[in-house]
């Protein structure tokens, strides 16, 4: 894996201690709700089999792995950015903020943070800066990122299920807030409410129309 070709001495220390946090996000594309991120530090003495990119796992498998990760990980934390923050900052910067919150909230301070994707924000924990690397498709390559992907995905899906119970006419349980035909039809008929991202073009167009 390419990430291991650019390790610094500080990174090597991090690997030797095992304090590596994997970070991933879910929910950049939906029209509604928070963007959700997770940071996970796995226990090398309690390996978890079957970890992978959450999008490649069935809902049943994700739920089972979610419980196992919560039980076996040294620590994990969920970070998020609200629709209001997304509208203020834009989705990219809001996602970076949510990732920073996830890492800052860990009970243990990682020495290295591995982030899925092609960019990584500045991370700190208790005012101490942390080395980080971004890894393209890391959620299918690095166990801790896979675990973070699963924690974030299950968390956000459950929130969409709760939103579906409160607003059944929108069909959130099926489309999870993503811009599908059924979702567009629902907001055209019923309008939008506070948890919608008003800066996103389809929502903005409806509000301005």
UniProtKB/Swiss-Prot annotation:
HAMAP family recorded: RNase_HII_B
Q: Which GO terms describe its cellular component?
A: cytoplasm; ribonuclease H2 complex
Locate the RNase H type-2 domain: which residues? Answer: 18-209
Subcellular location(s) of the protein: Cytoplasm
Keyword Hydrolase attributed: yes
Q: Which PROSITE patterns match?
A: RNASE_H_2
Annotated catalysed reactions:
Endonucleolytic cleavage to 5'-phosphomonoester
| Gene3D superfamilies cross-referenced by the UniProt entry | Ribonuclease H-like superfamily/Ribonuclease H
Phylogenetic classification of the source organism: Bacteria, Pseudomonadati, Pseudomonadota, Gammaproteobacteria, Alteromonadales
**Comment on bound cofactor:** Manganese or magnesium. Binds 1 divalent metal ion per monomer in the absence of substrate. May bind a second metal ion after substrate binding.
- Return the SUPFAM superfamilies for the record: Ribonuclease H-like
Instruction: Summarize the protein's role.
Output: Endonuclease that specifically degrades the RNA of RNA-DNA hybrids.
Q: Does the record's keyword annotation contain Manganese?
A: yes
What does the record give as EC number? 3.1.26.4
- Gene for this chain: rnhB
Name the record gives this protein: Ribonuclease HII
User: Which InterPro entries does the record match to this protein?
Assistant: RNase_HII, RNase_HII/HIII, RNase_HII/HIII_dom, RNaseH-like_sf, RNaseH_sf
* Source taxon at top rank: Bacteria
